[in-house]
Amino acid sequence: MSTGSLSDVEDFQEVEMLECDGIKLDPNKEFGISNDSNEESSTCDNGSPKKGRGTSGKRRKAPSKKSPLGNINQEGKQVQRNAANARERARMRVLSKAFSRLKTTLPWVPPDTKLSKLDTLRLASSYIAHLRQILANDKYENGYIHPVNLTWPFMVAGKPENDLKEVVSTSRLCGPTAS
């Protein structure tokens, strides 16, 4: 499939070199290789005989020609690589800042402690579980059910249906829909 880019010219040159080196690419297949015996005995466009594989089974490399299109293509690839590297550095910087902010919000961790990202996530998860437990213990305080204790569709988590009717009728829900 042709994209019209400079790499198409380079790909075409590589195909010509491979054909002259005893390997014929099948145009119907993306990366298929056909080795017909009659193709090996024919000649290249420049009149030199195609080089087949010898008894050693090794293929000789044709000397590569430096072309101005190849240099432009290499520069384009380098620009793309540099841009991708810059995006990845920026992404990693944002991720590192997020982990450092998460680390500073954990109450049990001294500020000078070095934690891995995995340890930070584990501590944050256990801290969230601890906070949920505190909320679960205090969920009926002042007659309110905290929204974190509600599950879809706004039922108190972990209560049988009979108990839910009693809790909902005697408790008020937090938020704009509270009655």
Swiss-Prot record:
Subcellular location(s) of the protein: Nucleus
Statement: the UniProt record of this protein carries the keyword Heme: no
Gene3D superfamilies documented for this protein: Helix-loop-helix DNA-binding domain
Alphabetic keyword roster: Differentiation, DNA-binding, Nucleus, Transcription, Transcription regulation
GO CC annotations on file: nucleus
Domain of life: Eukaryota
InterPro entries in the record: bHLH_dom, E-box_TF_Regulators, HLH_DNA-bd_sf
Limits of the bHLH domain: 79-131
Polar residues: compositionally biased ranges: 34-46, 70-80
Spans annotated as Disordered: 23-87
Major place of residence: nucleus
Any one Gene Ontology BP term: branching involved in ureteric bud morphogenesis
Transcription regulation is among the record's keywords: yes
Record protein name field: Transcription factor 21
Organism: Xenopus tropicalis
Lineage of the organism: Eukaryota, Metazoa, Chordata, Craniata, Vertebrata
Gene coding for it: tcf21
